[in-house]
Amino acid sequence: MSQHHGTDTIAAVATPLGQGGVGIIRLSGPRSHAILTALFDSTSPGFSGFRPRVLHHGHIHDGTPQRRILDDVLAVHMPAPRTFTGEDVVEINCHGGPAILAAVLDAVLRQGARPAAHGEFTRRAFLNGRMDLTQAEAVAEMIAAPAAEGVRLAQARLDGMLGRHINALRERLELVRVQLCVAVDFPEDEVECLAPADFMHAVEETADAIRKLIGNYERARCWREGAQVVLAGQVNAGKSSLLNALLGRKRAIVTDVPGTTRDFLEESITLDGLAVRLVDTAGLRETGDIVEQEGVRMSRDLAAQADLVLLVVDSRLGTGPHEQELMAAMEAGSVLVVLNKTDAATEDELDRCVRSLAGRPHVAVSAREGKGMDSLAAAVREMVLRRSNALTADAAASDMAPNLRQTEALRRALEELEALAADIVSGVPYDLAGVRLESACSVLSEITGETTPDDILNRIFDSFCIGK
């Protein structure tokens, strides 16, 4: 990819807003080094200028004739092209107070830099050929990953594995297209061309590889996005107590008054490396209260959309008609029964409750005493992964799971190849077949950014935070 060094210099705070030990101001562009030199006073005797990629200690001043010191900093200059963006880059490590960072950034901007747009540093890295588009997207996904396994998934794409695989598929189709063009343009010459059987084999083999990538998207979804787990059950079964126990803090109001939870509460946690969105819902019961009726209706809707339902049952009372109705309406493997309040149940009550489940998966806990939480977490993880036919975390990283945009493009490419295979069988002329091959190659190029339209690039990079 050709170089597209920016003609201007951009700057932004590269660390999260708020108080912290260290905050970083990042600059990229042709004036980065000059701006740093204008604002920096070294504390090292005999300082003669910035050595590339070496941290230097000193003071940043405000750029006025008075040279008022703004902060005590560590600064580094990284010359192009071996930088993240492919341009001259400067990073100023300040103390992490918002007022300090704002003052230093203001001084930088007054020296001629402009504020960076969302994702502009990574966009410049892409435009300057430092990474392909799949790697650029992986940067944002690593930052947004809800758990460690999601980071691993994004890291595999940041390493360029997916982009290289897509390019290999596209290059194979390009080779086939070239051979078709030769056959069309020089029909009377004795040139080596693909036999129809070889042509079909190349198309089908590439289509199979694309199908696998598409399947990997859904099978890696729980690692990338996390799972939605809904807590449902009768009023006073202990759903809110269970939510609090899983979170390790009091989030939901717990009382003996039926119908305390009318709306739903949502919190995120990590269970055995799996990011989970826990949703506590209104208790299932018949009620004349209009607000509570809406809460019960919403509970059923949320349960139907969940990756897993934790059906919380008072182990002293067992399952009633509402619980039985919910279990009957749900798909097999989508409900884990949580037998709660085991600290207050007799052995006979607990045995009777287990028998009523007719072999359905269940875990016995006491939310009030915090007992059984580890077993519950393990069961949730196992059932979510089994139900979604999820790749293992290792396989999700090594098998190159694409994101949604990439998967949609892969589906379009696959449609072209499947139509092409049908054309081959029906004897469509090679020149028409070449049009479909060209279309499939073009779509694959969009994935890596070789031919991606500007509106798609804008959508991708606008989703980044400023400073990245």
Curated annotation (Swiss-Prot):
Report keywords, A-Z: Cytoplasm, GTP-binding, Hydrolase, Magnesium, Metal-binding, Nucleotide-binding, Potassium, tRNA processing
Q: List ligand-binding residues for GTP.
A: 236-241, 255-261, 280-283, 366-368
Report the Gene3D superfamilies cross-referenced here: P-loop containing nucleotide triphosphate hydrolases, Probable tRNA modification gtpase trme, domain 1, tRNA modification GTPase MnmE domain 2
* Enzyme Commission no: 3.6.-.-
Any one GO MF annotation of this record: GTPase activity
Subcellular location, in the record's words?
A: Cytoplasm
Matches recorded under SUPFAM superfamilies: P-loop containing nucleoside triphosphate hydrolases
Cofactor(s) demanded: K(+)
At which positions is Mg(2+) bound?
A: S240, T261
The UniProt record gives the binding positions of (6S)-5-formyl-5,6,7,8-tetrahydrofolate as R26, E91, R130, K468
Q: Which residues does the annotation say bind K(+)?
A: N236, T255, V257, T260
**What Pfam families does its record include?**
MMR_HSR1, MnmE_helical, TrmE_N
Q: Which GO terms describe its cellular component?
A: cytosol
Question: What NCBIfam families does the record tag this protein with?
Answer: mnmE_trmE_thdF, small_GTP
Protein family per UniProt: Belongs to the TRAFAC class TrmE-Era-EngA-EngB-Septin-like GTPase superfamily. TrmE GTPase family.
- Give the quaternary structure: Homodimer. Heterotetramer of two MnmE and two MnmG subunits.
User: What name does UniProt use for this protein?
Assistant: tRNA modification GTPase MnmE
Q: Which organism is it from?
A: Oleidesulfovibrio alaskensis (strain ATCC BAA-1058 / DSM 17464 / G20)
